[in-house]
Amino acid sequence: MGGMRLTSGLLRPIGLMVLLTISALNQRSDANIHEVATFTDTDSCCLNHLIRNWFGNVYIAGVNRLYRLNENLDFLVSVTTGPENDRDGEQHDTFNKILTINYDNRALITCGGYHGDCQKRNLYNLLSVIGSNDPVFVVSNKTYESSVGFVAPNYHLGHPLLYVGTTSTSNGPGIPFVSGRRIEGDQIFEVVEDRRGSTRVDVALAFTTTFPVTYVAGFSYNAYSYFVTIQRSFTNSSDYISKLVRVCQLADQYYFNSYSEVTLRCRDDSYNLAQAAYITRPAQDLSQSLALDDDEEVLFIAFAVGVNNPPTPTTKSAICMYKMSAIERAFQDAVEGCIINDGPSVQERYTASWMRGATCIGSLPFTREIHECSAVTNYTYANGVNDQHGYDVEDYTDTLVTSIAVTTVQQHTVGFLGTGTGTILKVHFINSICANTYEEIKFKNSTKPILQDMVFDLDEKHFYTFTDNIYEDFSYTGWINGQYTSSFIDKRCT
């Protein structure tokens, strides 16, 4: 899963990568950290992204550098990605914005840099297989603006696309907020445009500079591509909210016209800024508590109380869970309201009017199978008017949660939360109303914020996490001989 990375332009020497194991603790305290292996590189600064492939290799994208390591963080290969020259010959550092894999042809995809373009790279030697001498603008070229991208199917076209969400930018003509990019063929990284429509969603020209959208995370689920976003509550508002937006992977015409949005709420309205997200199928106990459908997954999101203009997170955080079946119903309601609404005032509420070409026809019969994915001419860009409230299970009064990853251990659902002070919180998600934070792990050699990318190894016995200049692999064993420590199973929500 991809996410928002607000990177710094400050250059600091050396990236340190460390393999660590961490002993089980019985309470929230400093961890006993055992260093197993280290990797250092003096040619780089400021890490941006990490991803693991199906074979266990780990890829790390830093400023002007890209690495491939094995599962033990042993160095395998690296390549230089920057700096890049502008038209005047001035050099600009290359900050990576997107790092993802197209498994159909075993290619690593990287995006970023001064031109905001993408490269298709060999998974093994990291060399660019396909690039362009005339860059295709895909993502923002500003280090402080967000971009999220991931590879997911497009069933009508018959091959995957690179789904991208990026903050409004000035580098290049008309970069769409949300787009589906070709990753095969002659028009690589171009938007799909043909007689049926296009795979792009643009903000209305009137709001290009006044309606910024921050992209936090993205994922694929049940033939839709989703993005977690932060945006203004209304076009003329100074208040910000978090929204989930999606496009359909099945549309056979008018491709992305079925783009729609739903507002996310957690705890109360003050927790308005989504910081990180993770989608997974929880373990048995939590699945039963949530009454999940077969194979249904849950979206975990970390929120922060924010201050506005610009939207800035504070150290008050909350974790909310969303059943994907409820999310899907909320999007269905948005489309249905857009199609069958009665009267101009209702029609206006269901229209995502900040998007170029948005319209709700109204007064038409709604058929989910026909309209939810294929907009045809009945609507373009629906806005849900009913907020989607999550299960509020944990909160922190003095901790900014910056990243989240969730896994299952036996019948338990366990989360790992990165913080703004460089620690990791271990959380037991017990049921639909509560969770227990039962351990705090100190991130060795750094108090810098944990960045969003947290991934598990192939066996899910370790997880990888990093700050902007330290990369580590943790063992997350919290039990002894298959049994949880007493504090883990005895603590109860009160």
Describe the function of each predicted region:
Residues 217-219, 318, 405-407:
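Residues within well-ordered beta-strands of beta-sheet-rich folds
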Residues 45-49, 401-404, 448-455:
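Canonical WD40 repeat/beta-propeller blade segments in eukaryotic WD-repeat proteins
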Residues 47-52, 59, 98-101, 217-218, ...:
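Short, exposed beta-strand/loop patches in secreted or surface proteins that constitute
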